[in-house]
Swiss-Prot record:
Main location (coarse class): plastid
Native organism: Guillardia theta
Annotated protein name in UniProt: Large ribosomal subunit protein bL32c
Record-level GO cellular component terms: chloroplast; large ribosomal subunit
Subcellular location field: Plastid, Chloroplast
Protein backbone atom coordinates (compact mmCIF):
# COMPACT_ATOMS: atom_id res chain seq x y z
CA UNK A 1 0.00 0.00 0.00
CA UNK A 2 1.33 3.46 -0.92
CA UNK A 3 2.41 5.53 2.05
CA UNK A 4 3.48 9.17 1.75
CA UNK A 5 7.13 9.75 2.55
CA UNK A 6 8.22 12.04 5.33
CA UNK A 7 8.98 15.59 4.32
CA UNK A 8 12.63 16.65 4.15
CA UNK A 9 13.38 19.31 6.74
CA UNK A 10 14.10 22.85 5.60
CA UNK A 11 17.53 22.83 7.26
CA UNK A 12 18.56 19.69 5.39
CA UNK A 13 17.34 21.20 2.11
CA UNK A 14 19.27 24.41 2.81
CA UNK A 15 22.37 22.43 3.75
CA UNK A 16 22.30 20.44 0.52
CA UNK A 17 21.76 23.57 -1.54
CA UNK A 18 24.66 25.35 0.21
CA UNK A 19 26.91 22.36 -0.46
CA UNK A 20 25.93 22.36 -4.14
CA UNK A 21 26.49 26.13 -4.34
CA UNK A 22 29.95 25.86 -2.78
CA UNK A 23 30.94 23.13 -5.23
CA UNK A 24 29.75 25.20 -8.19
CA UNK A 25 31.64 28.27 -6.92
CA UNK A 26 34.81 26.20 -6.59
CA UNK A 27 34.45 24.93 -10.16
CA UNK A 28 33.90 28.49 -11.40
CA UNK A 29 37.04 29.69 -9.60
CA UNK A 30 39.07 26.88 -11.14
CA UNK A 31 37.75 27.68 -14.61
CA UNK A 32 38.62 31.36 -14.22
CA UNK A 33 42.06 30.46 -12.93
CA UNK A 34 42.72 28.23 -15.94
CA UNK A 35 41.46 30.90 -18.33
CA UNK A 36 43.75 33.51 -16.75
CA UNK A 37 46.66 31.13 -16.97
CA UNK A 38 46.01 30.45 -20.64
CA UNK A 39 45.67 34.14 -21.48
CA UNK A 40 48.97 34.83 -19.72
CA UNK A 41 50.52 32.22 -22.05
CA UNK A 42 51.91 29.99 -19.36
CA UNK A 43 52.93 26.57 -20.64
CA UNK A 44 51.46 24.47 -17.86
CA UNK A 45 48.16 24.44 -15.99
CA UNK A 46 47.81 21.88 -13.20
CA UNK A 47 50.61 19.75 -14.68
CA UNK A 48 48.86 19.63 -18.06
CA UNK A 49 50.77 20.85 -21.10
CA UNK A 50 48.92 23.42 -23.17
CA UNK A 51 50.13 24.15 -26.66
CA UNK A 52 49.95 27.81 -27.65
CA UNK A 53 49.94 28.97 -31.22
Amino acid sequence: MAVPKKRTSRSKTNSRFANWLNKSNLQAQRAISKAKSITNKKNTVNDETIETE
